[in-house]
Amino acid sequence: MYILILIGIIGLAVLKAVLSLPGRIGKSGERRVARKLEWLSEGYIVRNDIMLPTQYGTTQIDHVVVSPYGIFVIETKNYKGWIFGYENSEEWKQSLVGKKRWYGWSSEQHKFRNPIRQNKAHTIAIKNILSDLGDFKIIPIVVFSDHADLKITTPNYLVVNWCDLRSVIRQHSTPCISESSIKAIISKLDSANIKEKEIRQTHVASVQRNLTQRKHAIENRICPKCGAALVERYGRYGTFLGCSSYPKCKFTVNLD
């Protein structure tokens, strides 16, 4: 009996660990956003989980919404807690309040790549794919979980919670894309979308490898963009590492 109980406890612990993996958490958030986008009116055409070719390989886009009012390119982050960041910073920070201990509340902090920069790469890929059709209005949006408290400074960029996503999209109400162009855009995106499992797996492995290499480079005070040395500097928002080849290379990363 005790063995069965122990096996059950271990099984639940393993299941919780698997469900807490970043990849699964991310996919859960993407599904949540996809369901919200389904409730937009018929004039909005949604495509989820698109992978497009680029000059550097491939890029994966969480959601694209094509409408008469523009093309919305959406990056989903299923994060909770306090989210700190600036529009042009290399990294943002997630701060989580944990359990109450005898010495006070425990907390965790995690850094992650600035999602605005991620989404800029997505918008460039879409522009390149659609270049022969015309120059269309593209509205990039970063959307976080409703459990995230956004303490960010992004005056030129839309960063919202799940609950505000549809209303933010509907705020764009000036028609700028014709019905025929919408059909051509969807056709172009669908034909360019890479669906082969092997290529998608290669993309995921490449992203993980690049993140690891980038982390190691920064730890060794080497610029991951150009290979020059990173030097410590002090700016308006505190101490940071900047590329020694500035202004030729403008890579920076905050120091906490």
Task: Label each residue range with its predicted role.
Residues 1-59, 66-71, 77-87, 91-256:
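Surface-exposed interaction regions that form or flank ligand-binding interfaces
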